Regions:
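DUTPase catalytic domain/fold
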Residues: 1-130
């Protein structure tokens, strides 16, 4: 038996406390913690205010699990098309040893400021094998 586990350390946000993904889900949706204004025509770095670690879990013998850190990716959800935003670096590659804050660079391609609402989900974390 082997599987992928994602540890999320929220820094003040409670959005992830009861979040459970189902078998077959492509990734884990990320919630914006606050209202964020992205100025028109600008690129900015947005902080999700979480730290994460993804591990590949193997059962090495009955009942004994071994966790090996693995890299993961930050990608846009398909619903981002409804906004003027796009991920500035297309795909964010997060190394297996990175333990800093999870952030995303976004471009606002509109002629108007765009407001990201708290709890809005425009990005997700996925395993590279997807």
């Amino acid at each position: 038996m082997d599987f992928i586990r994602l540890y999320i350390k929220p820094n003040g946000t409670k959005f992830y406390e009861s979040k459970i993904n189902l078998d077959g889900d492509a990734g884990v949706d990320l919630f914006f913690p606050n209202m964020i204004r992205v100025p028109k025509g600008e690129t900015m770095l947005v902080d999700f205010e979480i730290n994460c670690k993804m591990v590949h879990v193997n059962e090495i013998e009955l009942g004994h699990l071994f966790e090996e850190p693995t890299s993961f990716m930050l990608v846009p959800r398909s619903s981002i098309f409804r906004t003027p935003l796009r991920q500035a670096n297309n795909i964010g590659i997060i190394d297996s040893g990175y333990r800093g804050r999870i952030m995303v660079p976004v471009d606002n391609r509109s002629n108007e400021d765009y407001i990201i609402k708290p709890k809005e989900r425009l990005f997700q974390l996925v395993h590279p094998s997807l």
